[in-house]
């Protein structure tokens, strides 16, 4: 069966109780149930970096990927580490560039775009909203 890349900038939690944790696991399971070989690029930034290198090797070796499916976190991708510091801030954009370079179609489930609305600025203040807006937009670039 065809191979796909499944990406999430966080570790998956099969015991999650909220939709933002349940959905990624169910989507991963659904792709497997459909018969896809799933190349998993999830976990910590270090894990994703290692998995990205392995994926690059597979592509350079001629493996064909049908598509990439990505789940966003509820916070900016580069801030998903436990301390919210980006030890590998370019690993996820590098994955997207790699997919583009090899002509792999990509799909992104983007949740919680509350930061784009005026009430976010009112809740967190103008400076924080401006800074976070830049980081969120970087995710979408």
PLM features: what roles do these ranges have?
Residues 108-109, 114-123:
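Glycine-rich, charge-decorated loop segments at or immediately adjacent to ligand/cofactor-binding or catalytic sites
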Residues 90-101, 125-141:
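Membrane-proximal helix-turn-helix segments that form the acceptor-binding/catalytic region
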Residues 11-20, 75-90, 119-127:
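Short, flexible/disordered intra-domain loops and linkers
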Residues 1-46, 53, 63, 102-103:
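N-terminal subdomain of nucleotide-sugar transferases
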Residues 45-52, 83-95:
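Glycine-rich anion/phosphate-binding loops
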Residues 59-91, 103-109:
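Short N-terminal targeting/anchoring amphipathic segment
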Residues 10-12, 45-46, 73-76, 112-116:
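Short, solvent-exposed loop/turn segments at secondary-structure junctions
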Residues 49-61, 123-126, 130:
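Charged, often glycine-rich, active-site loop that binds/positions anionic groups
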């Amino acid at each position: 069966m065809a191979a796909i890349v499944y990406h999430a900038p966080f570790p998956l939690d099969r015991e999650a109780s909220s939709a933002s944790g349940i959905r990624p696991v169910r989507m991963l399971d659904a792709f497997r149930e459909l018969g896809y070989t799933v190349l998993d690029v999830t976990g910590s930034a270090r894990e994703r970096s290692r998995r990205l290198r392995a994926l690059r090797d597979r592509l350079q070796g001629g493996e064909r990927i049908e598509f990439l499916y990505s789940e966003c976190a509820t916070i900016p991708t580069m801030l998903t580490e436990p301390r919210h510091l980006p030890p590998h801030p370019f690993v996820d954009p590098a994955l997207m560039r790699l997919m583009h370079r090899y002509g792999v179609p990509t799909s992104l489930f983007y949740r919680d775009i509350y930061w784009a609305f005026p009430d976010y600025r009112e809740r967190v203040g103008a400076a924080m909203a401006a800074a976070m807006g830049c980081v969120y937009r970087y995710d979408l670039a």
